[in-house]
């Protein structure tokens, strides 16, 4: 049974066939203002809203220009990003000037609900992506978008119910995202407080009944380097390191096979062993270290450095490498400016010379490791809830419009 019928029936709305019209018949796509770089100010009366402000760029430019009213976006306005990362957005902040790569949508037909139109445009974005092999880097022309045919219930009340339904779902997703972000900030804060800052012997925050100073130990004195190869093809599972998800199946992560078909020359990594990925990325300037938790074994390229803990609690070591306290030591062994094709030039012998500041009391190590593992489990639980809600929304959108 189509979802639009379910909603019509559930809300006691009369069922009528949906109409199909061109967007340009009901919606006016208003151009934003083009700015030269010299017109963009560091301070001013109005913020200038650019495409990047919806994504990863949190830097704002300003303008003191007084423009005609249709060049401003106000709270509640429906916008459409037509360049780079394209798609609809509802602006929910203060009055801004919107940039040239953004349209403001002015609905000309009083029988078209803004919230419904926003929801339909989300599904249309997915159709456009599919027609361009899934890329989000698309330039949508005004002529093209005005000719897009959209389906709409003639009953305004039905449109509003549909729009409200998805808005409530979006609000629930946003709430769970905020909870997840807060939990990650809490974890980050505890990592900063429960490990000693550089040159300090004790952390700012500590469990009761532990008093001794933390001492420095070289990684080589508390771990063992692993050089085991996959000669007998004990594993055919190629692994990769994700900064967010740890050591995971390479085929699933990239959605294709990256590793060589012959993995005999790869390292064989077993559950509980650690791998250092020397690839640097945003937020991880010295690479990442992760433990293999999700599989019994797997194979990794010899570009990785593999080791296992021998004289340190494994959970504690995992959380130590989740922090940034080892960055300073790692930076001392990397030649200045020597970063080759995204890889740091840290030799394995140098990596094991890294000094870690650790509590010598094994019980304290265990307690710290357990504390962060429990916090991580809560974070994973919220991540799973968020993923399920996102899947639910996609399913409803598909049932509704496609």
List PLM regions with ranges.
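Feature detects amphipathic, helix-rich regulatory segments
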Residues: 1-402
């Amino acid at each position: 049974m189509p979802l639009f019928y379910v909603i019509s029936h559930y809300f006691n709305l009369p069922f009528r066939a949906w109409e199909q019209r061109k967007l340009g018949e009901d919606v006016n796509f208003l151009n934003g203002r083009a700015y030269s770089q010299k017109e963009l100010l560091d301070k001013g009366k109005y913020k200038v809203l650019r495409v990047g402000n919806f994504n990863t760029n949190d830097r704002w430019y300003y303008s003191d220009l007084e423009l005609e009213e249709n060049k401003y976006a106000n709270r509640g306005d429906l916008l459409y990003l037509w360049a780079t990362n394209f798609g609809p957005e509802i602006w929910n902040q203060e009055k801004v000037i919107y940039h040239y790569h953004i349209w403001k949508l002015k609905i000309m037909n009083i029988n078209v609900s803004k919230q419904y139109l926003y929801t339909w445009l989300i599904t249309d974005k997915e159709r456009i992506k599919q027609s361009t092999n899934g890329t989000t880097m698309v330039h949508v022309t005004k002529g093209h978008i005005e000719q897009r045919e959209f389906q709409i219930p003639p009953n305004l009340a039905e449109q509003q119910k549909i729009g409200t339904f998805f808005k409530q779902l979006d609000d629930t997703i946003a709430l769970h995202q905020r909870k997840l972000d807060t939990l990650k900030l809490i974890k980050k804060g505890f990592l900063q407080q429960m490990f000693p800052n550089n040159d300090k012997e004790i952390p700012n925050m500590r469990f009761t009944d532990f008093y001794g100073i933390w001492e420095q130990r070289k990684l080589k004195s508390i771990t063992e380097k692993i050089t085991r190869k996959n000669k007998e093809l004990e594993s055919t599972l190629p692994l990769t390191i994700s900064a967010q998800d740890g050591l995971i199946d390479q085929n699933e992560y990239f959605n294709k096979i990256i590793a060589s078909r012959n993995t005999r020359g790869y390292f064989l990594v077993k559950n509980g062993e650690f791998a250092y990925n020397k690839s640097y990325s945003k937020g991880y300037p010295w690479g990442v270290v992760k433990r293999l938790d999700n599989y019994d074994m797997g194979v990794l390229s010899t570009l990785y450095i593999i080791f296992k803990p021998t004289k340190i609690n494994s959970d504690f070591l995992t959380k130590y490498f989740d922090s940034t306290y080892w960055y300073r030591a790692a930076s001392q062994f990397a030649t200045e400016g020597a970063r080759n094709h995204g890889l740091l030039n840290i030799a394995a012998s140098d990596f094991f010379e890294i000094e870690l500041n650790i509590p010598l009391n094994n019980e304290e190590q265990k307690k710290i490791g357990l504390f962060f593992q429990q916090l991580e489990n809560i974070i994973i639980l919220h991540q799973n809830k968020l993923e399920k809600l996102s899947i639910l929304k996609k399913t409803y959108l598909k049932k509704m419009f496609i």
